[in-house]
């Protein structure tokens, strides 16, 4: 596996552990609907949370969350709708982004952006 894939996978595991430490229940990881993928599907009390994980080794050119563009949002929302329908879930849901930034010290800075975006109309 390429080094950047290892970094991304490690970041997703760290994000899962972070969510668990906050009391979330992890329902799915890397859930796919066709070519669309949701990194983490979790439950926060009675809310289904669809989480996009973005990690970077630096933020010189852009912040990790800047990689979640409109096309990515559309794909996440479509996959989330498929998940909710296929699992017959009618509870509230939201879309979060967790960013991990590798600091020069080797530590990670984790940021959790709740309700990072809403589903665009017509999707």
Where are each of the predicted segments found?
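Short, glycine/acidic-enriched loop or turn micro-motifs at the edges of active sites
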Residues: 31-33, 55, 99
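Short acidic/glycine-enriched loop/turn segments that link adjacent beta-strands
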Residues: 33-36, 106
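Structural motif
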Residues: 35, 48-50, 92, 110
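Mg2+/Mn2+-dependent nuclease catalytic core
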Residues: 57-78, 82
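Domain-level recognition of nuclease-like catalytic cores that cleave nucleotide substrates
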Residues: 86-123
């Amino acid at each position: 596996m390429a080094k950047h894939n290892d970094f991304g996978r490690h970041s997703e595991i760290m994000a899962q552990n972070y969510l668990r430490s906050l009391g979330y229940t992890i329902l799915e990881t890397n859930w796919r609907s066709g070519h669309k993928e949701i990194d983490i599907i979790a439950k926060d009390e009675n809310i289904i949370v669809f989480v996009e994980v973005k990690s970077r080794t630096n933020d010189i050119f852009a912040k990790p969350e800047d990689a979640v563009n409109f096309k990515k949002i559309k794909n996440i929302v479509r996959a989330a709708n498929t998940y909710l329908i296929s699992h017959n879930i009618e509870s509230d849901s939201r879309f979060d982004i967790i960013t991990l930034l590798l600091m020069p010290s080797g530590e990670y800075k984790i940021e959790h952006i709740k309700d990072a975006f809403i589903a665009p109309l017509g999707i």
